Amino acid sequence: MTEQKQVKKPSARRRARECTVQALYSWAVSGNTAEQVELAFVLDQDMDGVDKPYFRKLFRQTVENIETVDFSISPYIDRAFDELDPIETAILRLAVYELCFELDVPYKVVINEAIEVAKVFGADESHKYINGVLDKIAPALGRK
């Protein structure tokens, strides 16, 4: 008898975070407005299983608060923003937005979700980098 590992389907919120990272990436590299990116994303992407209102909230609020988010990240990264991988930047931006503004989400959940999203979209070792940066940022924001 062979055992099959059951693959757990990502939660609707995880899918919302994955979509938010993709939309933040698109926004950063395309030069399009947040509204254009959001509309194109919702129309063109597979949004099955996504908590769409949560996606919209995360994307809009991260963009709206981008200066605060980037200011919070800057002291904890080892290079300039423009030298970071754009996917890593998008993941960090989303996670730091959540750490700063979504206080009902436990910081361990924020960090774990960022790591899991990095495993899906990032380079081979990017989840380790994301974890290291967020482990420094969370206490600085009073989230530990």
Curated annotation (Swiss-Prot):
An example of a Gene Ontology BP annotation on this entry? DNA-templated transcription termination
Query: GO CC: one term?
Result: cytosol
* SUPFAM superfamilies noted in UniProt: NusB-like (SSF48013)
What Pfam families does the annotation carry? NusB (PF01029)
State one molecular function term (GO): RNA binding
InterPro entries membership: NusB-like_sf, NusB_fam, NusB_RsmB_TIM44
Could you tell me the keywords of this UniProt record?
Answer: RNA-binding, Transcription, Transcription antitermination, Transcription regulation
Origin: domain of life? Bacteria
HAMAP family per UniProt = NusB
Role this protein plays? Involved in transcription antitermination. Required for transcription of ribosomal RNA (rRNA) genes. Binds specifically to the boxA antiterminator sequence of the ribosomal RNA (rrn) operons.
The Swiss-Prot or TrEMBL record describes its family as follows:
Belongs to the NusB family.
**What is the protein name given in its UniProt record?**
Transcription antitermination protein NusB
